[in-house]
Amino acid sequence: EMACLMHDIGNPPFGHFGEAAINHWFNTNLASVTPERCREPNTGIGVIFKHLAQDICNFEGNAQGIRIIHSLQTLNLTYSQSAGILKYTRPAGLDVKDIPQNKNYLMKKVGYYYSEKAFVEALQNELTIEPYCRHPASYIMEAADDISYCLADIEDAIEKGIITIELLCTVLKNHYQKVLINLTIDDTEHQDFVSKAVNYALERGKAQPYNFNSEFFIYLRVALLHPLV
C-alpha cells in the first residue's frame, strides 16, 4: 500500500510531457551553462560532473522518486519500503546499448541517479537482490498501477462520450470469459467475478440516477481493484 501511494512521488508537473521538457532543456542548454572547471574530464570535479550531467539530462520520474525519499526529503523508510517503488533498475549512467538482454524490460528507463547509487547498492545488498533485479513488492505495485490507471482511462472515455457504459459492461464480460478460457479456470467464483462486479456497480449507479456515471465507477473500482491485485 505504501509503495502504491508513493510510486509517483517523483513525477514532475505535466507527467511524461514534463519529463520530456526537462530533458530537452538540459540536453539543449547544459553545455552553455557548464562552468569551465567542470569541463576538464580528468579532474575530480570533471568526473563527478559527468555523472551528474547524465542524471539531469536523463530526468525520469521514477528515479526522482528515489531521490526524493532518500536524498531530498530523507523519509527514513526501510529498505523494503524503498525497494517497493524502485520500478526500474537502470542507473542513469548506463547507456541503453549496455543493458543486459534479459533485463530489457526492467531497465528500459532510468531507475535511479548517481546521487542515490550508494543507497541502491546498499539496499540490494541488505535485501539480497541481484544487480538490475526488482523487489517482489515492486511487481505488485506495478500491477496495481496498471489496473488503476486503465480504469481511470476507461472512466475518461465514458465521460467524454467515446464509449457508453452499456458497451463497456458487454465488453468487460465477454473479454473476461475469453481470458478465462486461456487460463483454464472453471470454478464458479472466478467464472462470475467480472459479471458480479459489473452488475453490482450498475445497481449502485441506478440507486443514484442523478450521479449514475460517478457512482458506477466508484463501485466498479471497489469491486475490481483489490481482487485483481
Where are these regions (language model features)?
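Sequence-structural signature of the catalytic-core scaffold of metal-dependent phosphohydrolases
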Residues: 1-2, 9-220, 229
